[in-house]
Amino acid sequence: MISDNIKKGVIRSPNRALLKACGYTDEDMEKPFIGVVNSFTDVVPGHIHLRTLAEAVKNGVYANGGTPFEFNTIGICDGIAMGHEGMKYSLPSREIIADAVESMARAHGFDGLVLIPTCDKIVPGMIMGALRLNIPFIVVTGGPMLPGEFQGKKYELISLFEGVGQYQVGKISEEELKCIEDCACSGAGSCAGLYTANSMACLTEALGLSLPMCATTHAVDAQKVRIAKKSGSKIVDLVKQDIKPKDILTKEAFENAILVDLALGGSTNTTLHIPAIANEIENKFITLDDFDRLSDEVPHIASIKPGGEHFMIDLHNAGGIPAVFNVLKEKIRDTNTVSGKTTLEIAKEVKYINYDVIRKTEAPVHETAGLRVLKGNIAPNGCVVKIGAVNPKMYKHEGPAKVFNSEDDAISAILGGKIVSGDVIVIRYEGPSGGPGMREMLSPTSAICGMGLDDSVALITDGRFSGGSRGPCIGHISPEAMAGGLIAVINDGDTIKIDMIGKKINVELNNSEIENRLKSLKIPEPKVKTGYLSRYSRLVSSADEGAVLK
């Protein structure tokens, strides 16, 4: 066992003494050491219940002959960080979390890990750190939040972001907005739709890193506690059998995750996190081109918030990820999982599917997959749109550019009534390096939707979007403005042509004009010159490479 390096032999007497000071016994030191990586915080609703899950995990570890050690990582709430400088820290926090998991596990000689994340960057961050170690691990995601209810209608967080736009144009009163505010977020769990946190939980299960039904089992459900306890027991088995993550995370396993993502219409942020996770196995093991290639294999089969009418609880009650495997069984690759069963074995065991929620592939929500990769002179390295949450009339759009050098300027223009039907909003210098931190554009996209402009106005950016964004919002434009990408020289009034079905995005400029503009481009000074974000800005790679640190 790896832990023998800190607990075996006379020379390790001082190490054992320190462990005994924590209450561990000689008998405990004969067992596998299991790190329980918690991300509890009372700031984030997705994480307020994780102490309970950690205790269940530890009970499972003890019951199967292991010795658990709990430690914590940070966890940022994207919703609270949204719309201000705090959002610049969200994506960069993924790398801090990965480094923390790697550092703690290596320093203390753990034989295996149970990861307990919930929200957006914590899930991929923990997995990335654990993969660097290639020791057995299993993931217990914290689970979704139940939707709130007011006057017979269900609400969730995005109702508030869009409600601000509705209030601005007089569609609802301030009193109505306050009533929605008081009920929309019902308690513990990640926001109730298929936003980034829940998308990543679903893909974690699809990768084979969680037990069946873990992703969709809600935070307040006792089944989540049982899954946590079973996961604690299972990790001891994985350590004893020496089943390592790289035995599970094959190319085919990543393809399964992408297929599930495309079929469900997950968050565009998955196109950052899945390549970043895969990068810990091998450089460019998975790229944006894999999303593009696989998007032709599956249709969009689930109408889930923000682009549809269903909530995560509906997906869970419809059969969860095992039911999605079943519906996609002709496409899903048969890969191993931490449960000991293969993906197709899990699919075969499904006893019930609600086909109103998880559609059959021959009767999908949309014929096209839920995510689409576009390329063109604006984005030669690619960009991404959640086409499953776009009004079909906006699949093709041509309009004049309204250019802004920050999210804040764009929000002021939108709420100030300066955006009109037909416009293409361009927000630049918000990429991984330029932002820095690649802020999510939920506030502008929600304002557009709330004001009723989402069927006539497009938004393109080198930043990214919340999993809660809907409408014709195209993000991750690569190369970004800070790297001298063409988005940096688009001017007000330039004609932008978008063809989502044809996978194209271009600005109508001839090559000579493009060359002249790029020659005269002056890249601005970095926005942040001290602290972590300054280092991040210098070291981060492009969005099409997962925005990982070089």
From Swiss-Prot:
Keywords: 2Fe-2S, Amino-acid biosynthesis, Branched-chain amino acid biosynthesis, Iron, Iron-sulfur, Lyase, Magnesium, Metal-binding. The keyword Magnesium applies. Signal peptide: none annotated. [2Fe-2S] cluster binds at residues 119, 191. Binds 1 [2Fe-2S] cluster per subunit. This cluster acts as a Lewis acid cofactor. The modification N6-carboxylysine is found at residue 121. One of its GO terms (cellular component) is cytosol. InterPro entries: Dihydro-acid_dehy_C (IPR042096), DihydroxyA_deHydtase (IPR004404), DiOHA_6PGluconate_deHydtase_CS (IPR020558), ILV_EDD_C (IPR056740), ILV_EDD_N (IPR000581), IlvD/EDD_N (IPR037237). Pathway: Amino-acid biosynthesis; L-isoleucine biosynthesis; L-isoleucine from 2-oxobutanoate: step 3/4; Amino-acid biosynthesis; L-valine biosynthesis; L-valine from pyruvate: step 3/4. Its cofactor is [2Fe-2S] cluster; Mg(2+). Mg(2+) binds at residues 78, 120-121, 440. The active site is at 466 (proton acceptor). Its EC number is 4.2.1.9. It catalyses: (2R)-2,3-dihydroxy-3-methylbutanoate = 3-methyl-2-oxobutanoate + H2O; (2R,3R)-2,3-dihydroxy-3-methylpentanoate = (S)-3-methyl-2-oxopentanoate + H2O. GO terms for biological process: isoleucine biosynthetic process; L-valine biosynthetic process. GO terms for molecular function: 2 iron, 2 sulfur cluster binding; dihydroxy-acid dehydratase activity; magnesium ion binding. The keyword Ribosomal protein does not apply. It comes from the Archaea. Functions in the biosynthesis of branched-chain amino acids. Catalyzes the dehydration of (2R,3R)-2,3-dihydroxy-3-methylpentanoate (2,3-dihydroxy-3-methylvalerate) into 2-oxo-3-methylpentanoate (2-oxo-3-methylvalerate) and of (2R)-2,3-dihydroxy-3-methylbutanoate (2,3-dihydroxyisovalerate) into 2-oxo-3-methylbutanoate (2-oxoisovalerate), the penultimate precursor to L-isoleucine and L-valine, respectively. Homodimer. Belongs to the IlvD/Edd family. This is Dihydroxy-acid dehydratase. The gene is ilvD.
